[in-house]
A protein has these predicted regions:
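Predominantly a Rossmann-like dinucleotide-binding segment in NAD(P)-dependent oxidoreductases
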Residues: 121-228
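Conserved SAM-binding strand-loop segment of SAM-dependent methyltransferases
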Residues: 47-53
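Structural detector of well-ordered beta-strand residues that form the stable sheet scaffold
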Residues: 50, 89, 114-116, 146, ...
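N-terminal Rossmann-like dinucleotide-binding module
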Residues: 1-44
Length: 228
């Protein structure tokens, strides 16, 4: 029986339902979120509620943690879990700076724990079906793949009630680039066994961004400038 702690109510509830459907032998023993209104929705008395993240990581009954917090918190939560010897399943991206990634990698090795980056798009039904067909040789000898993941996040980057930026909006404000590259290259890696066990690895990866102009347009539709 695996005792699981969850960080992040919204996606955390989804993962609980998925595990139940799969009939996996697990217990959700703890949940942390900084939104008190969401935590009050949890009716299961066996799940201990935490409003302080340090207290959450100090809870001795957690074997593994599912991290579904906003992007900027992923590395901090992962490092805290690793220091406690807790196995980790973390949403993407795992980190935002190379130095953070190296620190996490070294800590995982030192603590001898399991870490998995939850690149969910690899397991989308269409990608699983495509991988199966590729493995069967239905597309012959593949020498070139072009892929893209398109997710229009403009509508979920700010509140339409008060204009306040969501965590996605805050990320866009400080960084105009692709912070989810694994959504595009993850499935391709699965198709071609790139980076898996003793298989081939990417020699280089390039990402290009353009000036972001559409966000201001859609924002002004909801919150037009007041005329003097």
């Amino acid at each position: 029986m695996i005792n699981i702690g969850i960080i992040g109510y919204k996606r955390g509830v989804k993962i609980i339902n998925i595990l139940k459907k799969k009939k996996i032998n697990f217990n959700v023993v703890a949940m942390y979120d900084n939104d008190d209104a969401k935590l009050k929705l949890i009716k299961d008395k066996n799940i201990k509620i935490f409003r302080n993240e340090n207290s959450f990581f100090d809870y001795k009954y957690i074997d593994a943690v599912y991290i579904a917090s906003p992007v900027s918190h992923h590395i901090n939560h992962s490092i805290k879990a690793a220091k406690k010897g807790i196995h980790i399943l973390c949403e993407v991206p795992a980190f935002q700076k190379i130095a953070e990634g190296k620190k996490l990698k070294n800590l995982i090795k030192a603590k001898k724990i399991t870490y998995m980056m939850a690149e969910n798009y690899c397991y989308a039904p269409q990608n699983i079906a495509l991988k199966r067909s590729i493995k069967k040789g239905e597309f012959g000898n593949i020498t070139y793949i072009r892929s893209s993941y398109i997710h229009d996040c403009k509508d979920i980057s700010f509140s339409k009630k008060n204009g306040k930026l969501t965590w996605r909006g805050l990320e866009r404000k400080k960084f105009n680039g692709n912070d989810y590259p694994t959504h595009s290259i993850g499935p391709v890696s699965k198709f071609l066994n790139i980076g898996q066990f003793n298989s081939e690895k990417f020699s280089s990866i390039h990402s290009f961004g353009t000036k972001e102009i559409s966000m201001s347009d859609i924002y002004s539709k909801f919150f037009p400038k007041k005329k003097n």
